[in-house]
Design a protein with these regions (language model features):
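A conserved acidic beta->alpha catalytic loop
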Residues: 24, 31, 39-48, 68, ...
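Acidic helix N-cap motif at the loop->helix transition within catalytic regions
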Residues: 17-19, 44-52, 94, 98
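Glycine-rich, basic loop-to-helix element that forms the pyrophosphate-binding segment
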Residues: 65-81
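Donor-binding/catalytic cores of nucleotide-activated saccharide
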Residues: 70, 91-194, 201-218, 234
Length: 314
């Protein structure tokens, strides 16, 4: 008998895509699935759609709750999930038929607490899937660094052992970077992780993209998570060079986001980001980064307008 996999789907204002999402999960080639639909107080037809799916398929369980955001909905799902492994899907998205068979196979064959895959982005329709190369990490520092860097922080591209998650939950105070923080905390309990570069998840980019919906709170949240990770004991264990590289990588990403969205026009916000970049600069220049990245960091720190004006025109 396959190990039970609980898949948690937060549902809010997703009536356009919800049926597609649910159908893609229930038609998985992996045989032992529990689907937890968490209606996060959705004001549209989603609550009734969730109940309808539960009546049609015994594998579907439904939670109705007051609206409090995706993190709260995921946490409610985690509290109900009874599987030995857990996955997450966003209600606007869908998955390939063999996604969970592939992830669970990689997890079980490698005794991995986390198993991930690549994904398609609807804003980049010409992407093709990779050949399915599998990378297995078993060194603790490598696993923590993988999560700490923030480059692979989407929880919907992975399955996790319930044992590794334990009592860890999503931080409901964050409006962004909650996936990143969750992955980092779980990574402390991961002995082995396995990743395939095969794209098995379909991410639906909203017309009003994240960039256009950014605000200072979201970027400050990301920086707060960065500071927490770099300041934590596990973050410090990565070494000064690794930590300096991660810190500057995220700060420059935040700077670019703020430029594209125009948030950096707020003087206090720009001062705060520049202050943090300058504070991180000395360590970054000595961490072995490429000359191109070092020059870019210096421009951000001391000549912000040289970069911000062209960025806004893109």
């Amino acid at each position: 008998m396959d190990k039970l996999l609980s898949i948690i789907v937060p549902v809010y204002k997703a009536e356009k895509h919800l049926d597609r999402c649910v159908e893609s999960i229930l038609s998985q080639t992996y045989g032992n699935i529990e689907l937890v639909l968490v209606d996060d107080g959705s004001p549209d037809a989603c609550p009734a759609m969730c109940d309808s799916w539960a009546k049609r398929d015994w594998r579907v369980r439904v939670i109705h709750k007051k609206n409090n955001g995706a993190s709260s909905a995921r946490n409610a799902g985690l509290d109900m999930a009874s599987g030995e492994y857990v996955g997450f899907v966003d209600a606007d998205d869908f998955v390939e038929p063999d996604m969970y068979e592939t992830l669970m196979k990689n997890a079980l064959e490698n005794n991995a607490d986390r198993s991930g895959c690549g994904y398609f982005d609807s804003s980049r329709p010409d992407e093709i899937s990779a050949d399915g190369k599998i990378t297995v990490l078993s060194d603790k520092n490598s696993i923590i660094a993988y999560s700490a860097c923030g480059k692979h922080n989407n929880v919907w591209r992975s399955v996790y052992s319930k044992k590794a998650i334990g009592k860890i939950r999503f931080d409901e105070s964050l409006v962004i970077a909650e996936d990143w923080l969750f992955n980092y905390e779980v990574s402390k309990n991961v002995s082995v992780q396995a990743d395939t570069d095969k794209r098995l998840y379909h991410y639906e980019s909203a017309p009003d993209s994240l960039m256009s919906r950014l605000n200072d709170k979201k970027i400050i949240d990301r920086i707060s998570v960065l500071e927490y990770i770099c300041g934590s004991e596990c973050g410090k264990s990565l070494g000064r060079k690794e930590t300096a590289d991660i810190r500057m990588r995220v700060l420059m990403f935040c700077a670019e986001e703020s430029m594209h969205s125009g948030i950096d026009r707020e003087p206090w916000f720009k001062r705060e980001v520049i202050k943090k970049i300058r504070g991180a600069l000395a360590a970054f220049l000595g961490c072995g980064a490429s000359a191109k990245r070092k020059i870019k960091a210096i421009i951000f720190a001391f000549a912000w307008p040289l970069y911000s004006a062209p960025a806004r025109r893109k």
